[in-house]
């Protein structure tokens, strides 16, 4: 407020307060003027319906009409938008009308579940004009819903509501087959499963089968309501246009003889359908489907014996394969050299000779050694150069048992030591050694793990047999005793 005294000057804050008060008073006056102008508008004034205050050109861009400064208030913004909007030209009106009329056509509504949902949601069938403006093809023409509403005034097929914000068809929307809405028609199939009609399944000469079927259906369903028509559909015949649309939805139509019973009221059709469900439940009888509802799902009967046999065979094969893999894995694991075996020590000078001797411990090599003097140890499939190159010596189960028996039994350990000392001096091809080995094999036939041939495997980490401190040394500047036979594999 301004002060009356001359001494006190109005400060800047007081002046700002005065100006704000004046501005607020001006805004109030403008609001009152606009309200009076709105009351004086006639009923036919299009500005009454096409209020610019909505601002948004489409639902996807709600902030478009609210851009700009806010200091002057929403009233000035409405005035600017009212001045910006202009009625569309004739060409744009025609394009908008054609496009939206296509949206509401039967051809499009049958496929467009989204728009059909909005049509069914409103009891009067109205759809928002702003929603239609947000559609892709309409948005290419205009983004202002007021332009769309103005163009729809010129449509003959569509009509706007009182406030020009919603639109609907002038004709009612029919019931489409893809909708799960009950209709007045009842599809009856498996006719001749009825006890009163099964005798008519055989062709008769008088040709009155169809008439008797219709009489039975009229008598059966007439108790639920007034029947407008009964039609018999036979396979291979041309279907009526209204039934042709649902032929792809219901497999019974066109494939077997069935009947279409149409009632005058939807409630009567629903009652008849419920009655047929209770009658056909748990027994063979003719069945009925209410047109518009989901068709019954056919569940094929599964033969349990047929299904269980391949399943059991598959499980058996899997278990056998798994067992074979386990045995192979165990065999590979037992045949592979461990880090504690002397064969795995690459620094040992005796590794090559021991590896060659190990090849003779295989069953095939062992049999060839005694049965055929001229047999070569290379005939064994386990003594191939590839196996030697990989450093993997496949040992028979006798070898594994021999290792355990030699280490656990003192007597067997002594025998192993005797034969190891003999074989280190005597050539493996000596007849005396063969006879001695054959005698030992005969006496200990029941315990093959005590074979003297396996004693070479019982060695320490230095490459020496168990119980041997060092190998004998020969004279100086020589290769030791029996140097000419060192190149041969010792047993």
From Swiss-Prot:
Question: Molecular function terms in GO for this entry?
Answer: mRNA 5'-UTR binding; mRNA binding; myosin binding; RNA stem-loop binding; sequence-specific mRNA binding
Q: What does this protein do?
A: Regulates the coordinated translation of type I collagen alpha-1 and alpha-2 mRNAs, CO1A1 and CO1A2. Stabilizes mRNAs through high-affinity binding of a stem-loop structure in their 5' UTR. This regulation requires VIM and MYH10 filaments, and the helicase DHX9.
Q: In this protein, which residues make up the domain named RRM?
A: 184-296
Record bears the keyword Metal-binding = no
Nuclear localization signal (motif): residue ranges? 296-302
- The UniProt regions of compositional bias labelled Acidic residues, in chain numbering, are 24-37
One Gene Ontology BP term is:
RNA processing
The UniProt entry's GO CC annotations, sorted and at most eight, read: cytoplasm; nucleus; ribonucleoprotein complex
Q: Where is the composition biased (Polar residues)?
A: 359-386, 444-453
Q: Which gene encodes it?
A: LARP6
Name used for this protein in its record: La-related protein 6
- What is this organism's lineage? Eukaryota, Metazoa, Chordata, Craniata, Vertebrata
- UniProt remark on domains: The RRM domain mediates the association with collagen mRNAs stem-loops.
Q: What is its main location?
A: cytoplasm
């Amino acid at each position: 407020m301004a002060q009356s005294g001359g001494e006190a000057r109005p400060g800047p804050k007081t002046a700002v307060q005065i100006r704000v008060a004046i501005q607020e008073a001006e805004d109030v006056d403008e609001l009152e003027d606009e309200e009076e102008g709105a009351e004086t508008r006639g009923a036919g004034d299009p500005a009454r319906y096409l209020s610019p205050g909505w601002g948004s050109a489409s639902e996807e861009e709600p902030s478009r009409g609210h851009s700009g400064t806010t200091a002057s208030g929403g009233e000035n913004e409405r005035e600017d938008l009212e001045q910006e909007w202009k009625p569309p030209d004739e060409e744009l009106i025609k394009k908008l009308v054609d496009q939206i009329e296509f949206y509401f056509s039967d051809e499009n509504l049958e496929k467009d579940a989204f728009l059909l949902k909005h049509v069914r949601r409103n009891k009067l069938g109205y759809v928002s004009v702003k929603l239609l403006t947000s559609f892709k093809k309409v948005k290419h023409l205009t983004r202002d819903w007021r332009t769309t509403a103005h163009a729809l005034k010129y449509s003959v097929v569509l009509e706007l509501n009182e406030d020009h914000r919603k639109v609907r068809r002038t004709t009612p929307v029919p019931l489409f087959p893809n909708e799960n809405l009950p209709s007045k028609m009842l599809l009856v199939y498996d006719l001749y499963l009825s006890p009163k009609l099964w005798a008519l399944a055989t062709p008769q000469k008088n040709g009155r089968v169809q008439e008797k079927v219709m009489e039975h259906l009229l008598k059966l369903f007439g108790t639920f309501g007034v029947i407008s028509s009964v039609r018999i559909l036979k396979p291979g015949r041309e279907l009526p246009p209204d039934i042709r649309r649902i032929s792809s939805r219901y497999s019974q139509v066109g494939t077997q003889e069935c009947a279409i019973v149409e009632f005058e009221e939807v409630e009567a059709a629903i009652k008849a359908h419920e009655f047929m469900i209770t009658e056909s439940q748990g027994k063979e009888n003719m069945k009925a489907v209410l047109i518009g509802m989901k068709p019954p799902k056919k569940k094929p009967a599964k033969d349990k014996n047929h299904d269980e046999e391949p399943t059991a065979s598959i499980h058996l094969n899997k278990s056998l394969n798994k067992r074979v893999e386990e045995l192979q894995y165990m065999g590979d694991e037992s045949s592979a050299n461990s880090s504690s075996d002397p064969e795995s020590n690459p620094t040992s000078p005796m590794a090559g000779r021991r590896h060659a001797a190990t090849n003779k411990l295989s069953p095939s090599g062992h049999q060839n050694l005694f049965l055929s003097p001229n047999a070569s140890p290379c005939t064994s499939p386990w003594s191939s150069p590839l196996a030697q190159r990989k450093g993997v010596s496949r040992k028979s189960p006798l070898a594994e048992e021999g290792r355990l028996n030699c280490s656990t039994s003192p007597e067997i350990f002594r025998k192993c030591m005797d034969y190891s000392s003999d074989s280190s001096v005597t050539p493996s091809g000596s007849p005396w050694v063969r006879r001695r080995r054959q005698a030992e094999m005969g006496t200990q036939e029941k315990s093959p793990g005590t074979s003297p041939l396996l004693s070479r495997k019982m060695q320490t980490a230095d490459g020496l047999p168990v119980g041997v401190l060092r190998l004998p040394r020969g004279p100086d500047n020589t290769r030791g005793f029996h140097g000419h036979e060192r190149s041969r594999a010792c047993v």
